[in-house]
């Protein structure tokens, strides 16, 4: 595995890959890798000759008072995991390397950001698409792989690629879970022992909503309330949101007559976790 810490080194290595006509799959991450990230690498390796992973904690997507400074980081650990999984090129830039001067251009997302995480994190997805587009320009991959645990991010990035005619295929990949159903997340390490025992209740509550939907309930408000009640019964932290939205348009709906996303965000003492289920219409 080749580790590149500068843009020039990355681009020099990628020129070699292109000269050899090798296809490139890209897995962008913020590090502190877990099985969810590694499952993206596995998928990329199945479909491409070369796999590039980036590890960069992007300051543009963190707002005031958010967890930029405390976001878990362990590059030595991440490097070992990436190499063991078969990553070919690991791009690990500093903030100064990615943003050597104050930005004169920043993308602004105008659709699908006033709900879910975007509602309480103004500017978050502007920062996400800005860094993702920059990484796409640097890596020029054939395809990029994203986990559906953050389905809103997948939708926003997909829309950005379509709107700007970016020549990168977006490959959404299923959420990877612990055996008890908790979605794999870098923030899980910040849960207390008690919170870790409660946390699978996020997924269980989503399943309760899915069960009501499967039983024939089409009123989105009823589904939301069923999920909320389940969360209140199972967990002792604070509900950030419970939503039932169209997907991938992320529009509020009253009746469920299309593919929807059931989504929750929950605030524990030192970690905010999100989870979701996408329910295709007719299933």
UniProtKB/Swiss-Prot annotation:
Subunit structure: Homodimer.
UniProt KW keywords: ATP-binding, Cytoplasm, Ligase, Nucleotide-binding, Pantothenate biosynthesis
Name the record gives this protein: Pantothenate synthetase
Role according to the record: Catalyzes the condensation of pantoate with beta-alanine in an ATP-dependent reaction via a pantoyl-adenylate intermediate.
Chief place where the protein resides: cytoplasm
Record gene name: panC
Enzyme Commission code(s) on record: 6.3.2.1
GO CC, alphabetical: cytosol
HAMAP family registered for this protein in UniProt: PanC
Record InterPro entries: Cyt_trans-like (IPR004821), Pantoate_ligase (IPR003721), Pantoate_ligase_C (IPR042176), Rossmann-like_a/b/a_fold (IPR014729)
EC main group: ligase
Organism in which the protein naturally occurs: Halalkalibacterium halodurans (strain ATCC BAA-125 / DSM 18197 / FERM 7344 / JCM 9153 / C-125)
């Amino acid at each position: 595995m080749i580790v590149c810490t500068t843009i020039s080194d990355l681009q020099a290595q990628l020129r070699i890959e292109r000269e050899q006509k090798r296809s490139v799959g890209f897995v962008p991450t913020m590090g502190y890798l877990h099985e969810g990230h590694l499952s993206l690498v596995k998928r990329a390796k199945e479909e491409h000759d070369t796999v590039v992973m980036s590890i960069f904690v992007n300051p543009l997507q963190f707002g005031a008072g958010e967890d930029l400074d405390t976001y878990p980081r362990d590059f030595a650990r991440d490097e070992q995991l990436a190499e063991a999984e078969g990553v070919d090129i690991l791009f690990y830039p500093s903030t100064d390397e990615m943003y050597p001067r104050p930005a004169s251009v920043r993308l602004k997302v105008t659709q699908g950001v006033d709900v879910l995480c975007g509602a309480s994190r103004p500017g978050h997805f502007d920062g996400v698409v800005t860094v993702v587009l920059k990484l796409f320009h640097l890596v020029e991959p054939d395809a990029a792989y994203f986990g559906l645990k953050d389905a809103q991010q997948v939708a926003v990035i997909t829309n950005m690629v379509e709107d700007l005619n970016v020549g990168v295929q977006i490959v959404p990949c299923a959420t990877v879970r612990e055996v008890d159903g908790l979605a794999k997340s870098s923030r899980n390490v910040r849960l207390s022992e008690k919170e870790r025992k409660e946390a699978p209740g996020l997924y269980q509550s989503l399943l309760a909503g899915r069960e009501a939907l499967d039983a024939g309930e089409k009123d989105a408000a009823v589904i939301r309330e069923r999920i909320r009640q389940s969360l209140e019964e199972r967990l002792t932290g604070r509900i950030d949101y419970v939503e039932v939205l169209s997907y991938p348009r992320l529009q509020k709906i009253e009746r469920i007559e299309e593919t929807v996303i059931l989504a929750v965000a929950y605030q524990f003492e030192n970690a905010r976790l999100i989870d979701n289920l996408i329910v295709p219409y007719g299933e």
